[in-house]
Amino acid sequence: MFDRAQRDPSSAAWPGAHHSLAAELLRPSVIYAPAMLELAREVPVHAFAHVTGGGIPGNLVRVLPDRCDALVTRGVWDEPRIFSEIQQAGAVPDDEMEHVFNLGLGMLAIVPPEAALHAVDVVRAAGHDAWLVGEIVDGHGRVRLERRATPRR
């Protein structure tokens, strides 16, 4: 990426950033365990998906029964800027970005619809950003990412 984009790791992460590209790429992983344990105490969680390599589809599919699909709506959460920078610098198609990176959703919790708003509140109270990003519907064990134009909280 550095060669293709003609970027130096010590340069600003993006125009106006006050930290380097290297610092952004080496940002430590978020530890979700305490917040997810609290969520499990407060809400009947059906499943957790830790989104690592394989992106959202590759990790969420592991917790889906064969009779359900997960519909995830892009644009309802705040994607960290580094992902658009990587995509632009590498001319990476949307589909590849979705299958490689977590795009800012490091942990997904599947909860009953009636508990969803409370789940968001619990996770936010634990110090993490949280959004309602989709729903579970009848299906065949697939993850489908859809688009929404503007982020919402």
Residue spans for each PLM region:
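Glycine-/charge-enriched secondary-structure boundary and capping motifs
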Residues: 3-153
